[in-house]
Regions:
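Acidic/histidine-rich, surface-exposed loop or edge segments in extracytoplasmic proteins
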Residues: 62-73
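Residue-identity detector for glycine
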Residues: 10, 28-29
Length: 219
């Protein structure tokens, strides 16, 4: 009797497997993938933007890759639109004593390639082209911790590269991360959406990330 029950159970499980496989097949016999579902996927609700108050002596602005090669009305118009507001935040934060650190992205680019409106002040660090994560192959972590920095504000022309990867890397290193969504940009809207979603939901990262707007940052 037990053998019969076992056999019946096995048949039922096999039948269920067939049904499941049938449900995830598409015409042609290939398994359904996220790519097949791309056009019908629903966007998650937008993350909340929160007002933040920064302590200048414990805060560093990471002004990443705002250069003539990457940020212009022709090359990346969404970046060009963000520059005046980013400039205002940088000027105010610098005047209040916050640390400002720059980076350039394109191989061969130097500090003089940074946009005129965001020109570094004398003595401000400019990181060379390092790739998406500005902590890799640099002394950025040691510099920040050596100056008592607890919070970084991630600003950048390439949301899905420098802002996403440097912001996540900072969070994983124990820094609080502020991301003004109007201070990051890309070639299109989706990379900005993805960056905001990832930073606000990823395990071990989201707990240290605050999404905000530039006009919601106070001192």
């Amino acid at each position: 009797m037990n053998k019969l029950k076992t056999r019946v159970l096995g048949i039922r499980l096999a039948a269920i497997s067939v049904v499941v496989m049938t449900c995830v097949m598409i015409p042609g016999g290939q398994a359904q993938t996220v790519i097949d579902e791309w056009a019908t996927a629903e966007l998650p609700p937008p993350p909340a933007l929160k007002p933040v108050t920064i302590v200048p002596a414990e805060t560093a602005l990471l002004v990443m890759d705002f250069t003539t090669q990457t940020c212009s009305a022709k090359r990346r118009p969404r970046c060009a639109v963000s520059v005046p507001k980013v400039q205002k935040l940088v000027a105010e934060s610098r005047a209040k004593g916050a640390l400002v650190i720059y980076s350039v992205a394109v191989p061969g680019s130097v500090a003089t390639d940074i946009l005129k409106d965001l020109t570094p002040a004398a003595g401000e660090l400019v990181l060379p082209p390092l790739g998406p994560d500005k902590f890799i192959n640099s002394d950025l972590e040691q510099i920040l911790k050596g100056k008592g920095i607890k919070t970084v504000v991630a600003l950048g022309t390439q949301a899905q590269t420098s802002v996403l990867h440097t912001g996540a890397a900072a969070a994983l290193r124990g820094f609080n991360v502020i991301v003004p969504v109007d201070g990051m940009s890309s070639d299109a809207v989706f990379p900005e959406l993805y960056t905001a979603w990832h930073l606000s939901t990823a395990a071990r990262i989201s707990a240290r990330v605050t999404l905000t707007r530039l006009d919601l940052i106070g001192y």
